[in-house]
Amino acid sequence: MKKVLITGKNSYLGSFVRNELERKPETYQVAELDLKDPKWTDFSFEGYDVVYHVAGLAHSTPDESQKDLYYQINTELAYQTALKASREGVKQFIFMSSIIVYGSGKVGCKRTITKETPLTPDTFYGDSKKQAEIKIRSIDSDMKVVILRPPMIYGPHSKGNYPLLSKFAQKSPFFPTLGNERSMLFVGNLVQFIKKVIDLELEGIFLPQNQKPVQTKDLIALIAREHGHTIHFVSVFNPVLKCMRKQTIVSKVFGNLIIDPALSSFDLDYTKYSLEQSIQITESGGGL
């Protein structure tokens, strides 16, 4: 029996992990802790084998006025949670970082994350995650620390870029043919990965991803097909998009950012869902 504490109550990722683990009550005992409650520090972590930390401010387009808040939540709160876990005997701490610690994707040029790629975040969201990693890894204890740097995560009722792409794919008659490659991670595959990490009591830095990267236009085609919508791919918009490549929304949709498969080829067999299956599940809005 492993006791797992999810720090971040009712979070998107935490809820999927909780639901999966609770399918085997003889193997896992799961609890959630609301870190928005100022009294969270009174909660004892003693007796828990794993703390899965998902509390944090999500990647959006925040303005400068939110900068301090991002560091308070994404850096300092994460560090204090890990420190408390280490002091109270937790065996494994899993921290959700992000691929954004490497910087954003680039339009028009290939960008591959390898083991030599330095951490060069270009937003304070990315830097807040980087600083959290540094502080958490500096904790001197026997607690195993797991840092996850996933690419864009999507799934049923997800937030961020995917819902925008889905709406576009369902309604627009046209979409640019501008080529790009981007690593993605279906929430169902992430859940399987986290289960493996817990079961095998792993530690280290991991970059899980789907089996293959995907081009945005191919993703749009799959989504449109799920809804019986015909969409035509045209090149007329490509020059304009290239001129707008520094715009955040263009970079997010058409930027190139892939993870070297060598960094994700763990012998863990966690990619349970293919891209096609993941799109079917996501667009149906169902569960895993």
Predicted regions and their residues:
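Active-site Tyr-X1-5-Lys
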Residues: T120-V146
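A conserved pocket-lining segment of Rossmann-fold NAD(P)-dependent short-chain dehydrogenase/reductase
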Residues: D63, L164-L185, N189, Q209
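N-terminal Rossmann NAD(P)H-binding glycine-rich loop of SDR-like oxidoreductase domains
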Residues: K3-E22
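Glycine-rich NAD(P)-binding loop of the Rossmann-fold in SDR/ketoreductase-type enzymes
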Residues: L69-L77, T123, D127-S128, L185
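Mid/C-terminal beta-alpha module of Rossmann-like enzyme folds, strongest
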Residues: F193-V250, I279-L288
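NAD(P)H-binding glycine-rich loop region in Rossmannoid oxidoreductase-like domains
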Residues: D37-Q80, K84, Y102-S104
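Conserved Rossmann-fold NAD(P)-dependent oxidoreductase catalytic core, especially the SDR/UDP-sugar
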Residues: Q80-F124, V146
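Glycine/proline-rich active-site loop of Rossmann-fold NAD(P)-dependent oxidoreductases
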Residues: K130, D142, I153-L164, K196-F206, ...
